[in-house]
Amino acid sequence: MHSPGAAAYVFLQCLVALVAAVIAQSGADQPPTTVVEVTAHGSVSMTPPTPRSPLLNETELVELNQPGSTAVFVALPTNPPTVSVDSSSTTTVASTQEPTSTTERTMSPEEIQKLLLPPATVEADILHVNATDDNRPDAKSSGKDSECPTLEGADHLSQTQLLTRLTHVCRYDRLERPKRESINGTNGPVKVYARAYIYFMQNLEAHDLQFKIHALLQFRYVDPRLVFREVAPNRTKPIMGEQSLRDLLWVPHVFLANERSSDILGTAEKDILTSISPDGTVIVSTRISATLYCWMNLQKFPFDEQHCSTVLESWMYNEDDLVLLWEHKSPVTLAPELHLTEYVLLEMFTNETVINADLSDLRHGAFAGNYSSLSFTVHLAREMGFYMMDYFIPSIMLVAISWVTFWLQADQSAPRITLGTSTMLTFITLASAQGKTLPKVSYIKASEIWFLGCTGFIFGSLVEFAFVNTIWRRKRNVEVKKVNSKHVLKQAITPRPARKDMSGLHKSHSCTSLADSATTVSANSFNNYLTVHSIPQKSPSSATLPIISTTDVDRAMTEASNVTIQIEGQTSNVNGNGWTTMTPQEVAIWIDKRSRFVFPIAFVIFNIFYWTFVYYV
């Protein structure tokens, strides 16, 4: 198997033979000088013979096996060539005289291929090579029109022609920022003025801490290299273009520091507008859609106010090379039809600052320094209409419904339990629906304070029912010193035996409620009394056992019928010591009646404190 190098060598040998034959055939009419040298390692020396070629009577030495091959031009007299072929690894076709001059220049592989073309195409190929050399980035300006096009007669040039000459590599480098002379003569920073127009702003998404805008960002700066006022005095309109024009110019790289995602708007093409004024002022306008982070404070949710900023920063150049400034007139403008459904815009303000970046935080890649920054902030307040109708008013109604149990009798357990538990579950469901739209934060929010307050009142009504139901089922009367909240609740929680002083005898009553004999029960629902008289001992020598006597049921009922309890305007059974006897049912009813007023008044007081905190603290 032959190696690729051997195959290439055979091909070059055939090519040399073909060229030698062509030279020999045309030697009678024209004495060209062509040198073609092929070595084993792939070296070729050749001069294409053509009358129109500027390379006539020159030898071009090309090293094919090295990048950026070198061509050597050797001027030779126009003597007939001699051809010598031997069995060595080198074939040479050359004239018999030594070269008189030698010049060198670098040729690309494309030029080498063109040298191997037939003679008829050499002139066109050489023109192509010259044009390629003029447009190379590393080409040096020599002052010739072919290398650096002139700006004379710019008034008669088209916009594309003028732009092509202004941005030619001989006079413009798009990788280099514009130079601006400062007061002391040094190269000062480029001043870039910014302006923003907000088309659309989406409501803040609290659970993602972000908002979305559609805006037009415009940057204005002066590039002295693009001034054409002197060369084209009659051209007063700016040069306009889109993305293609922007790609030819130096443009400041400004990024959104709090960006989550962004994109340039546009359908068929991106919405980028670039203009160059005669005085060199460049304006670049871009329509963007951006999703930005907004770090919200939800402590007063849903009565919160948020400050959301859009931050612009210079990416590549620090403040020594580039300074960002807001336009003095209307730096940020909102579209008249812009309307937010959940928020109301209170104010908007702009700011110019400097951001310090060091190598530790990598804020600007591997660069450290002070970078210019711009920001505009919107102050938004949340609208309360939705939350009032969807959360606060329904929760107030649920709390009020829980108070209906105070008008039901204490022994009606089923309706009171059903009403209390259903109210509690409904309110928890209502509150959980609101919490799903919020992020999970560690601090307490205003909505959670409201939730805890309403839950406390609903739970309090359930506790009140359990309390009065327990008292209702007691079978022992309660004696209170005074019929007020302090004494009634104290005796209801920790009941004591009834006290009655009977002229030296301590008399106590106990009753047994017989539910089965409801038809014979007295007005106070007591049908059996046992009276125990205790005779105090006069001295230690007296009888050691007390005398106990019982009365029959009729006498007990007769005596009990003479006892009355003071309940809302009725006379109470007050003994000589000022104690009042109340039945358990009367205590339960008394607590329910007081709860009908205490709970609403307490809820009103809670609302006063809550709404004062929300709006004034």
Swiss-Prot record:
PANTHER family: NEUROTRANSMITTER GATED ION CHANNEL. Ligand and pH-gated channel that mediates chloride transport in the mid-gut and thereby may function in larval metabolism and fluid homeostasis. Channel opening is triggered by zinc binding or, to a lesser extent, an increase in extracellular pH. GO terms for cellular component: plasma membrane. Glycans are attached at residues 57, 130, 184, 234, 351, 370. This is pH-sensitive chloride channel 2. Residues 29-387, 435-447 are extracellular. Residues 97-106 have a biased composition (Polar residues). Residues 131-147 have a biased composition (Basic and acidic residues). Residues 409-414, 469-596 are cytoplasmic. Belongs to the ligand-gated ion channel (TC 1.A.9) family. Keywords: Cell membrane, Glycoprotein, Ion channel, Ion transport, Ligand-gated ion channel, Membrane, Signal, Transmembrane, Transmembrane helix, Transport. It catalyses: chloride(in) = chloride(out). The chain crosses the membrane at residues 388-408, 415-434, 448-468, 597-617. GO terms for biological process: chloride transmembrane transport. Residues 1-28 form the signal peptide. The gene is pHCl-2. It is found in: Cell membrane. Residues 82-110, 131-155 are annotated as: Disordered.
